[in-house]
Amino acid sequence: MEKRGMRYGFVAMLFSMLIALAAFAPSTAFADVTVNNKTDLQQALDNGGEVTLGDNITGSVTVPSGKTVTLNLNGYTLTADQKYAAITNNGTLTIAGPGTVDGSSLSQTAAIYNAPSGVANLNGGTFTGSKWYVIKNLGTMTIDGASVAQDDAGSSAIDNGYFGNAGNDCGVSEPSFATVSLTIINGSFSGGMNVVKNDDFGVLSITGGTFTNTDGPAVLNWNKATIDGGDFSVNNSASGVIANGSYGANSPDKGELIINAGTFTAPNNGSGNIFAQGQGGTSGGTAVVSGGSYNGSLDNLNNLNVDVEVSGGSFTDAAVAKYVKSGNVAMSANQGNGFQVVSEETAEANAAAKVQNGDSVIYFANIEDAKKFAEDNHIDPSFVEQLHFVITYVDGLTDAAYGSTCTVPAGQKLTKAAIDTPDGEELVPAKEGYTFTGWYLDKELTQKVTFPFEPSSDMELYAGFSKNDPAVNPSQGDNKTTTTTTKTSSAKTGDNLALFGGLLALIAAAGATTAVVAVRRRKSE
């Protein structure tokens, strides 16, 4: 027992010594350091951990493979001094701002190059450049809150994917297969030949952010791109807001564009084109649109080799009706406020009219808008078809509307004066002193409606009434005077005898009473 106790004591002492030694061991793998020059910055990146700029630094640095680094720009600027970038990332890098990373004026030099093995998260900071891409991504990158500004109209602000030659791919040869991922959650992005170019093998996802350009599209997609939000606007010489292109379904440039949401404003505040086609390629690829707001023209799609299919969204151009998916249509809720793409079932149930415009059909919420559209676009009035008729009910005596209407689908009969729909509650007018006589087509109450009734236009139905006769007082009868006569003749003989007999009986009774009183007095005396 004693030996066992000594053995346990020795082990406990050894364990305590190991803990003490560990406490004094250096811990530099995740050191939080502040750096003021290129050498110290590179050393900190080699070690990994949290690194903070303490001054403006000129120098191109690299995050090694296998290292995890959080770089806080701390309001300072890191400027490249050699190609291919101010920061080359082969590891896992998170950048926080404020501060700036500048690709400088060197050719083929970006602010940041994310290599195929790199994972980059740009959560802040401003990234600038003037001679090449501002951001070149061949790995996995997420941008949430950063700003990217391109001063060079000859290059895109962001290039996601392979260009196809080593010079534009930072010395890397394009593989036969790769997945290059860029996710943009939020931020501000501007300038360049394109603001964002989704290149070979690129998979682009945009859920938010502001994208502006003056010389080219906001987004050029060559492979796979999905837009679920964001504000996209271009101006001046831009060919369109969104450009798409493809080299075929089996190539690294599939040209598959999906737009579910977002706001898109064409050049010159909406007078230019929404879509454009990437230069080169074998086709314009496919664009599947299920939502979003589009201020711009679609007329140029006739000349583009882009297969566009629309199942949702709002558009200022009625030409969207040419590109709707089967089962969907374009509908104008209010003339001058654009066209919404809805299901044909929804349009048939809610629209008042539709207009055949060439090979397409456009629905309108009211008949007047449909007629105006036909007139403005030189469409024969016979191509305007009213789908529903509104019946308004009016008091035929006062010309005051009852406030109730009925919407009747074209071709359907009205079996009663229904409210809201033909199956709704029946309106039965009542007026004191009058009897309701039925509904009429005219205010003169000469054309009575016979139900079932099929309306052929919007119309008013007038309630007819007949005035009741004055009420008759039953006590007055027929107003003839009735008189009564009082009898004054003498009573008959039989009546007089009865009266005399009654008097005799009364006298006899009185005499008997007097006699009784007299007897009582004698006894008392």
Please place each PLM-identified region on the residue numbering:
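Acidic Gly/Asp/Thr-rich repetitive segments characteristic of extracellular carbohydrate-active
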Residues: D32-N56, A347-F383
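N-terminal extracellular ligand-recognition/capping segment immediately after the signal peptide
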Residues: K38-T39, G49-K83, F127-S130, S382, ...
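C-terminal low-complexity, Ser/Thr- and acidic/Pro-rich disordered "stalk" regions positioned immediately N-terminal
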Residues: E460-D495
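C-terminal membrane-anchoring or membrane-association module
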Residues: A508-E525
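Surface-exposed loop/turn motifs in large extracellular/passenger domains
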Residues: V63-T70, T88-G103, Y113-W132, K136-A153, ...
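Secondary-structure capping and domain/repeat boundary segments
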Residues: V355-E368, V384-A471, R522
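Extracellular interaction modules
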Residues: T282-G284, L304-V308, M331-Q340, A374-D380, ...
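C-terminal segment of classical bacterial N-terminal signal peptides
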Residues: I19-T28
